[in-house]
């Protein structure tokens, strides 16, 4: 008798995606981050739902409703900190996942890659709007500064900003709509993630060597379900360590002060996972130029398939490209550090050099390194 998972219309889809899926036999732990991102999304939706039951999106009560969640709701503090630190875990997995894609040449699956870029933008937008909701000082001023960037758009900029604000400043209308968008976006992300998987399963997974693995495939279950479960346990352990021992390690103390439009914090900065982009934005003196650089810092990923000049797909056997890749990683760490520093000498200069280097490595040095490697290998 045929197994029900192979004939039932619904189970059949799950079977082809999670059980009988032919998977390369040599994929490493770097391929775990896709499933870890799925787990992060599930944790965020689950904790977010319970937070939304107690949260009020009104400027008068938003801050005190978050205080109420932490003090009066049963395990409210745990749900709140799991949600806040869950966002950090989400971005750690996200950046490692993108880094893996760049290193092993996964961007050659252009549909999967482009949906991934859309997912990255959607997650960033969701995280930004979520940071506004507690209505602390950094929430308010972060929202003011970032939404104000749209005023750099010629002709329609000012009208666009006021339209997003729902008034002449960040106020009740802004908070209400941000809450609505923050609630709906994770479900859009889930739909996009399904599309991401759909396109991935059209081509099959890449592998560390970058060569086709059709002759050497193994079923996803039990081999990779076990491997993913280990990743799940490690992620949950790390999240619990962060949440239970140092819940405010990655947050900003300013956000424990209620939003006050009359008092500007000394250093306005976003959450740590946006600092690299914020540093690029700040390093350009022109407002419109800064906004364009900010968008391009992520959108540059979309042109990666066109910048691939190597005859090999993966960087596994390309030492010069590996040096370029790790220089890029170090550069991003420098940008993250600079984004959290005040706008003064020498941080401004370091930020400008690191920003130029970021674009130069991706646009010039990496394609050039690939061409040199081709030449050395006489390809």
Swiss-Prot record:
Cofactor(s) it depends on: heme b
Complex formation: The cytochrome bc1 complex contains 11 subunits: 3 respiratory subunits (MT-CYB, CYC1 and UQCRFS1), 2 core proteins (UQCRC1 and UQCRC2) and 6 low-molecular weight proteins (UQCRH/QCR6, UQCRB/QCR7, UQCRQ/QCR8, UQCR10/QCR9, UQCR11/QCR10 and a cleavage product of UQCRFS1). This cytochrome bc1 complex then forms a dimer.
Membrane topology (UniProt): Multi-pass membrane protein
Chief localisation class: mitochondrion
Note: Heme 1 (or BL or b562) is low-potential and absorbs at about 562 nm, and heme 2 (or BH or b566) is high-potential and absorbs at about 566 nm.
The protein, known as: Cytochrome b
Function: Component of the ubiquinol-cytochrome c reductase complex (complex III or cytochrome b-c1 complex) that is part of the mitochondrial respiratory chain. The b-c1 complex mediates electron transfer from ubiquinol to cytochrome c. Contributes to the generation of a proton gradient across the mitochondrial membrane that is then used for ATP synthesis.
Example GO BP: mitochondrial electron transport, ubiquinol to cytochrome c
Pfam families in alphabetical order: Cytochrom_B_C, Cytochrome_B
Underlying gene: MT-CYB
Signal sequence residues: none
Membrane spanning stretches: 33-53, 77-98, 113-133, 178-198, 226-246, 288-308, 320-340, 347-367
Molecular function GO labels: metal ion binding; ubiquinol-cytochrome-c reductase activity
Cellular component terms (Gene Ontology): mitochondrial inner membrane; respiratory chain complex III
Key words, A-Z: Electron transport, Heme, Iron, Membrane, Metal-binding, Mitochondrion, Mitochondrion inner membrane, Respiratory chain, Transmembrane, Transmembrane helix, Transport, Ubiquinone
Binding site for heme b b562: 83, 182
Record: residues binding a ubiquinone: 201
Family assignment from sequence similarity: Belongs to the cytochrome b family.
Residues binding heme b b566: 97, 196
Compartments it resides in: Mitochondrion inner membrane
Note on cofactor: Binds 2 heme b groups non-covalently.
Highest taxon above the source species: Eukaryota
